[in-house]
């Protein structure tokens, strides 16, 4: 069962899957709306009886200094990139618990959900929230036999920029995003750090099968992640050296 706000793209995806012999169905879904995501869940359980993997993948991008970010910009990013996954949990989790057996919930976050980036304030806030949601949920639902994974890629070949422009509606007013920065985020230089969707999907499936919480496709992210946690750890020593004893 696929959900997408873009009906044409949804129809194309369903057609491609059916051509490969997959029993695919699609429901138009705006993840900003809990009713839409709940309807998607209704249809998934109606058609298939059970659901074993839920993939919260919808996302948009925003770039620009925080001081230049409007309230509507904040709402737009948080509504899609954070409320979307929350709505996915609200709509599917109670039913996964009720059906029993093993199942898995996957969230797409970002490298920006682990390491903050200048000029990506709202995006980082949302993606950090997704990581926290996944980490907390993983601990809570483990006794229910439900696994959780959070995908934190750096750069993947997707239609991120086009999706952002298409999804933003008049409800959020004119965009204040730095178009050039978003373009760089969505269409980075062609080098070894850019992964294709198929490779990332394969790694994600492996994480589901292994019940692995973190999915980290880019080895280049490792040093940055280590430095961040080293800085946090050193703070305890710095404070102790200054006389803090608690």
Q: At which residue positions do the language-model features occur?
A:
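Substrate-binding pocket helix/loop in short-chain dehydrogenase/reductase
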Residues: 65-66, 73-75
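Conserved glycine-rich Rossmann-like NAD(P)H-binding loop of the short-chain dehydrogenase/reductase
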Residues: 1-12
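SDR active-site lid
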Residues: 143-215
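Active-site helix of classical SDR
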Residues: 89, 126
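Residue(s) in the substrate-gating loop at a strand-loop-helix junction
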Residues: 110
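Active-site-adjacent segment of SDR/Rossmann-fold oxidoreductases
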Residues: 115, 136-146
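The beta1-alpha1 cofactor-binding region of Rossmann-like NAD(H)/NADP(H)-dependent oxidoreductases
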Residues: 7-8, 27-39, 71
């Amino acid at each position: 069962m696929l959900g997408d706000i873009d009906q044409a793209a949804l129809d194309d995806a369903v057609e491609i899957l059916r051509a490969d012999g997959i029993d695919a169905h699609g429901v138009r879904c705006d993840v900003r709306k809990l009713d839409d995501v709940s309807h998607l869940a209704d249809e998934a359980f109606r058609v298939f009886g059970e659901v074993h993997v839920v993939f919260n993948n919808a996302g948009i991008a925003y770039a620009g200094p925080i001081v230049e970010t409007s309230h509507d910009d904040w709402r737009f990013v948080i509504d899609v990139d954070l409320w979307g996954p929350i709505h996915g949990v609200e709509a599917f989790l109670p039913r996964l618990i009720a059906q029993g057996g093993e199942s898995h919930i996957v969230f797409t976050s970002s490298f920006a959900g682990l390491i903050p980036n200048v000029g990506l304030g709202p995006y980082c806030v949302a993606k950090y929230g997704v990581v926290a949601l996944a980490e907390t949920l993983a601990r809570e639902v483990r006794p229910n036999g439900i696994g959780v994974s959070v995908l934190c890629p750096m750069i993947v070949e997707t239609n991120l920029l086009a999706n952002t422009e298409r999804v933003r509606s008049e409800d959020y007013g004119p965009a204040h995003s730095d178009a050039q920065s978003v373009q760089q985020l969505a269409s980075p230089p062609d080098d070894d750090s850019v992964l294709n969707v198929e490779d990332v999907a394969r790694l994600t499936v492996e994480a589901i099968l292994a019940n692995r919480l973190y999915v980290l496709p880019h080895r280049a992210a490792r040093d940055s992640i280590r430095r961040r946690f080293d800085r946090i750890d050193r703070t305890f020593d710095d404070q102790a050296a200054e006389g803090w004893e608690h």
